């Protein structure tokens, strides 16, 4: 705790000193957990000071209602390790992520539902998204920058409306 991240009229500051953020991607669930620290230290040695990471829904709720944050899927352990190594974290939480992941990161059970529209304000879709976001919040509780943790930002959604859609009007509600 006690760190400050701010902006003045010309640049960002970290603890009152000029700060130039350099971000790199590391998709933790795609790496063996035992490799995380070595790879993060390589990133830091290369000048990266912020790690952006997708949290692919499909990796954590393969079966509807059954969440898995164990092993290489352990979001909390990954974020804590980033802090230990001295890296800030940007969580890219989706719900749709892309990241060259099947279904854009949607679990199959979401992708192939026919009773609600994905990536819209459909109440059923938003019910599942809210439940997913609440599960992620449990994992990172206390690790946000304001709490003294390394999480300095959160990206919601990804590449929205950046691809051809057959029914754009339905998607405007999102």
PLM regions: where:
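Residue-level signal for pocket-adjacent positions within structured domains
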Residues: 7, 62-64, 140
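Aromatic-lined substrate-binding rim segments of carbohydrate-active enzymes
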Residues: 36-104, 108-110
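N-terminal carbohydrate-binding accessory modules
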Residues: 1-50, 80, 84, 88
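A generic structural signal for short coil/turn motifs at secondary-structure boundaries
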Residues: 31-32, 61-65, 161-166
């Amino acid at each position: 705790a006690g760190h400050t991240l701010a902006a003045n009229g010309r640049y960002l500051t970290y603890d009152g000193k000029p700060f130039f953020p350099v971000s790199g991607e590391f998709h933790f669930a795609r790496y063996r957990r035992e490799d995380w620290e070595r790879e993060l230290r390589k990133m830091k040695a290369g000048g990266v000071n912020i790690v952006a990471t997708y949290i692919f829904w499909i990796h954590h709720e393969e079966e509807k209602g059954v969440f898995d944050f164990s092993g290489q899927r352990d979001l909390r352990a990954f974020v804590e390790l980033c802090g230990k190594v001295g890296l800030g974290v940007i969580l890219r939480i989706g719900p749709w992520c892309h990241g060259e992941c099947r279904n854009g990161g949607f679990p199959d059970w979401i992708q192939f539902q026919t009773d609600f529209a994905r990536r819209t304000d459909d109440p059923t879709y938003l019910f599942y998204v809210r439940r997913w976001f609440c599960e992620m919040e449990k994992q990172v509780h206390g690790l946000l920058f304001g709490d003294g943790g390394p999480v300095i930002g959160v990206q919601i959604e990804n590449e929205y409306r950046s691809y051809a859609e057959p029914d754009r009007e339905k998607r405007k509600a999102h």
